[in-house]
């Protein structure tokens, strides 16, 4: 039976979600979207997401795809989804468009972009930031963190920064790792990679925080990176200060090629 593929772009405040992945009895981003789709379509669709975010993580632009037999008009689908989800004020469907059959939200992606927000003792703390900013009770040295970040960029085995896994590669191409102190004193850590392992972003930023506070030397950090095994010396930061900025894709004629390349690298 022929199906039509749709790309959905989604934004959400992750504070009150138990992550993306649908789970019985839990409020998740993917679960709410699936519930809405079941009311729209006769068939129970599968949903594939570009970046499976953990509980508490936010997104400015998440991407997923679904295959539907009913082939609704995408404009109608967008309005219907928004109507069904209007009471969920921390979730918004940005767009819904038809996608080619070889578009894959996860495997067609060539980049994921994140920002992690931190504030240290150099700046005033405002209580309203507690849902989106991680507070560090120390004076962080920006230049040390920037040196550490620049040394982590490239194609490497990031096993030291990933949750242990039995199968699959931990080799990733980290293209961007910037440390930018904002005018209000917040420190924003911008990261971009072809893909990230589970907890990798929060562990990478955690390593820089340890370097910035003087608890971890650059030499030790790069040594852990070469060993490529998880160490308690690198903390996993909390999820509430992490935001998925967006997902990048190649031009349409390159979808199939990118799908094959990604599947080969991840298995």
UniProtKB/Swiss-Prot annotation:
Any Gene Ontology biological process: tRNA pseudouridine synthesis
Binding, substrate: 114
Molecular function GO terms recorded: RNA binding; tRNA pseudouridine(38-40) synthase activity
Enzyme Commission numbers on file: 5.4.99.12
Database matches in Pfam families: PseudoU_synth_1
TM segment ranges: none
Active site (catalytic residues): 54
Function in brief: Formation of pseudouridine at positions 38, 39 and 40 in the anticodon stem and loop of transfer RNAs.
PANTHER family: PSEUDOURIDYLATE SYNTHASE, TRNA PSEUDOURIDINE SYNTHASE-LIKE 1
Assembly: Homodimer.
Protein name: tRNA pseudouridine synthase A
Organism: Tropheryma whipplei (strain Twist)
Gene: truA
């Amino acid at each position: 039976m022929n199906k039509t593929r749709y790309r959905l772009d989604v934004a959400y405040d992750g504070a009150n979600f138990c992550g993306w992945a649908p789970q019985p009895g839990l409020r998740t981003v993917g679960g709410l979207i699936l519930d809405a789709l079941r009311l729209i379509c006769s068939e129970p669709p599968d949903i594939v997401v570009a970046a499976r975010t953990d509980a508490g993580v936010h997104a400015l632009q998440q991407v997923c795809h679904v295959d539907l037999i009913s082939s609704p008009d995408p404009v109608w689908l967008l309005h219907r989804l928004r109507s069904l989800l209007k009471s969920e004020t921390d979730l918004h469907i940005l767009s819904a468009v038809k996608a080619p059959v070889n578009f894959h939200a996860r495997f067609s992606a060539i980049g994921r972009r994140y920002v992690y927000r931190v504030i240290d003792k150099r700046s005033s703390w405002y209580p309203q930031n507690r849902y989106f900013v991680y507070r560090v009770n120390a004076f962080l040295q920006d230049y040390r963190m920037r040196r550490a970040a620049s040394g982590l960029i490239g194609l490497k085995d990031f096993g030291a920064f990933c949750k242990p896994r039995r199968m699959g590669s931990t080799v990733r191409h980290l293209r961007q790792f910037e440390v930018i102190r904002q005018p209000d004193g917040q420190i924003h850590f911008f990261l971009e990679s072809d893909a990230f392992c589970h907890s990798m972003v929060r562990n990478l930023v955690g390593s820089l925080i340890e370097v910035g506070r003087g608890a971890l030397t650059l030499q030790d950090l790069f040594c852990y990176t070469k060993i490529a095994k998880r160490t308690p010396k690198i903390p996993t930061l909390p999820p509430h200060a992490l935001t998925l900025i967006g997902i990048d894709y190649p031009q349409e004629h390159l979808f199939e090629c990118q799908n094959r390349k990604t599947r080969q690298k991840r298995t």
